[in-house]
Amino acid sequence: MSAVPSVQTFGKKKSATAVAHVKAGKGLIKVNGAPITLVQPEILRFKVYEPLLLVGLDKFTNIDIRVRVTGGGHVSQVYAIRQAIAKGLIAYHQKFVDEQSKNELKRAFTLYDRTLLIADSRMPEPKKFGGKGARSRYQKSYR
């Protein structure tokens, strides 16, 4: 039995982490075991579709994508998912298709939105003493 060609990539946003498994298949795209069409709300679903729509859905009829995402909120998870999918498509094309198609995908993703391939490293600033947040201070009384 021959192994199915597959790659595994990850995407991150704040504390959300998504791991995408891209392999040869029949065009299934699942997020946490559910079809991608069930991602709610609709605006966030379109964000998840962006990497696929940029280069055309017809190119991915022979690729299965399964994404497992944990941590963070809804929006952070969606951005982690789209990054994992974009990186997975590029890794799959580099490993199993050809270098030229990989470069075309990479160029299209970078021109559209750099965060599809490069993680946003910003994190919340830690809370300090003397206030209720990172920068805010408790009110001072002079008498």
Curated annotation (Swiss-Prot):
User: From start to end residue, where is composition biased (Basic residues)?
Assistant: 134-143
Q: Does the keyword Membrane apply?
A: no
Using the record's annotations, give every residue carrying the modification N-acetylserine.
Answer: S2
Disulfide bond entries:
none
- Tell me the GO BP annotations in alphabetical order: maturation of SSU-rRNA from tricistronic rRNA transcript (SSU-rRNA, 5.8S rRNA, LSU-rRNA); translation
Q: Which Pfam families match?
A: Ribosomal_S9
**Region described as Disordered: spans on this chain:** 123-143
Q: Which InterPro entries is this protein grouped with?
A: Ribosomal_Su5_D2-typ_SF (IPR020568), Ribosomal_uS9 (IPR000754), Ribosomal_uS9_CS (IPR020574), Ribsml_uS5_D2-typ_fold_subgr (IPR014721)
Write down the superkingdom of origin: Eukaryota
- Output a single Gene Ontology CC term carried by this record: cytosolic small ribosomal subunit
Entry annotated with the keyword Nuclease? no
Keyword field: Acetylation, Ribonucleoprotein, Ribosomal protein
Gene Ontology molecular function: RNA binding; structural constituent of ribosome
Q: Give the similarity note.
A: Belongs to the universal ribosomal protein uS9 family.
This protein's name = Small ribosomal subunit protein uS9
User: What is the species listed in this Swiss-Prot or TrEMBL entry?
Assistant: Maudiozyma exigua (Yeast)
